[in-house]
């Protein structure tokens, strides 16, 4: 069994052990108050994978890190996984946007090979133009296609197949334009849309300049609102909690709950601009707490959470890096090195592998994504 000690206060202390996995099934946790009282340990079953499923090892496979009333239990037999990528059907949506003066113009839309034309006179308005275009598109009777009108735009969505669409309008041809899953510049986005509408902003051909904008409707449904940074709709939202270290929480006197941690989801970017932490696809060897960050070591990498957000290993913005963002570094050495333990010191983090040791630190003692380095 893996034994551990928890000291809540001078008068509330506990001794616990993680019992090894039997021939079948999973391990278990027993805890006693130092006064001899047997404690209640509840195994959480509210998630898709029960918490006890994480207890697959023996005493050599577990590491326990206790911070206040929570103990983080790491099993180095478990390979960390990300949540599955969602199903994303490209070009199933399209947005027609009006710009410029609506007076005395001709507007043309081609939807799935069907051409629609609408002309305005001196009394033309955005509302009359969009109403006419919507009526004409709806009259095509395309199966699965729905059209929604906003103040300066029409949104098309097809539940069956991709949409083929083009549009022109005005004397220069740019008073009516259309986009689907991406735009060249953020200024092309309409002022109204539906809640959680995600559009890729290209900016340039470089991947690092690309980001995703998500529409936040004021009423949580559609209409007026604002655009904020969002996540690539084709990529995973974050960590698979069933494969990550679990928490043992002291919920009351002599009562504990063992459960998955509510890891913060990835909210912005994609795998290029806001990648998963380096321990995804690897086995975590141990956890540590330093500089108001929770950290894990896996293979030759050290990953640390957002500052003061211990369960968040993702950046808050894909466009800029802040000092509070996660830190994720690899040990530089000519020999393979697997970090197996970590010792916090006043100078930094002392990292131990089987044959070498390293120091992770910064010049001013505060670890940040841009100022932290690892040296032998």
Positions of PLM-derived features:
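Residue-level marker for isolated small/hydroxyl-bearing positions within beta-strands
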Residues: 18-19, 74, 297, 352
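Acidic/polar, low-complexity linker and loop regions
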Residues: 27-53, 77, 249-271, 321-326
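Extended, beta-strand-rich, solvent-exposed assembly scaffolds of outer structural proteins
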Residues: 4, 11-69, 75, 95-169, ...
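Short glycine/acidic-enriched loop and turn motifs that connect beta-strands
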Residues: 22-24, 79, 301-303
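C-terminal globular interaction/adhesion domains in large, modular proteins
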Residues: 225, 231, 237-265
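Hydrophobic core register within WD40 beta-propeller blades
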Residues: 3, 64-65, 287, 342
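Beta-propeller and closely related beta-pinwheel folds
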Residues: 261-292, 297-376
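Post-signal-peptide, soluble extracytosolic/periplasmic N-terminal scaffold domains
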Residues: 85-87
């Amino acid at each position: 069994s893996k034994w551990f000690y928890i000291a809540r206060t001078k008068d509330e202390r506990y001794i616990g052990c993680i019992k090894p996995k039997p021939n079948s099934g999973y391990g278990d946790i027993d805890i006693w108050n130092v006064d001899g009282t047997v404690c209640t340990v509840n195994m959480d079953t509210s998630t898709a994978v029960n918490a006890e499923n994480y207890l697959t090892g023996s005493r050599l496979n577990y590491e326990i890190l206790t911070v206040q009333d929570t103990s983080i239990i790491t099993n180095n037999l478990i390979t960390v996984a990300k949540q599955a990528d969602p199903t994303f059907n490209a070009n199933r949506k399209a947005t027609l946007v009006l710009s410029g003066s609506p007076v005395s113009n001709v507007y043309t839309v081609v939807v799935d090979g069907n051409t629609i034309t609408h002309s305005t006179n001196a009394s033309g308005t955005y509302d009359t133009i969009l109403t006419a275009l919507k009526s004409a598109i709806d009259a095509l009777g395309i199966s699965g296609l729905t059209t929604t009108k906003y103040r300066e735009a029409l949104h098309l969505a097809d539940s069956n197949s991709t949409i083929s669409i083009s549009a022109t309008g005005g004397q220069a041809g740019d008073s009516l334009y259309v986009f689907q899953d991406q735009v060249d510049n953020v200024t092309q986005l309409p002022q109204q849309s539906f809640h959680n509408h995600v559009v890729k902003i290209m900016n340039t051909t470089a991947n690092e300049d690309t980001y995703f904008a998500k529409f936040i409707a004021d009423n949580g449904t559609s209409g007026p609102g604002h655009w904020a940074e969002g996540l690539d709709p084709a990529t995973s939202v974050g960590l698979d909690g069933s494969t990550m270290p679990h928490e043992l929480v002291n919920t009351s006197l002599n009562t504990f709950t063992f459960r998955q941690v509510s890891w913060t989801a990835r909210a912005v970017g994609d795998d290029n601009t806001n990648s998963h932490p380096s321990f995804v696809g690897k086995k975590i060897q141990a956890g540590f707490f330093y500089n108001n960050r929770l950290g894990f070591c896996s293979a030759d990498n050290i990953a640390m959470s957002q500052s003061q957000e211990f369960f968040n290993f993702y950046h808050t913005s894909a466009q800029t890096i802040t000092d509070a963002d996660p830190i994720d570094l690899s040990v530089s050495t000519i020999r393979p090195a697997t970090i197996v333990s970590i010792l916090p010191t006043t100078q930094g983090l002392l990292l131990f592998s089987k044959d070498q040791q390293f120091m992770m630190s910064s010049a001013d003692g505060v670890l940040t994504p841009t100022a932290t380095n690892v040296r032998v």
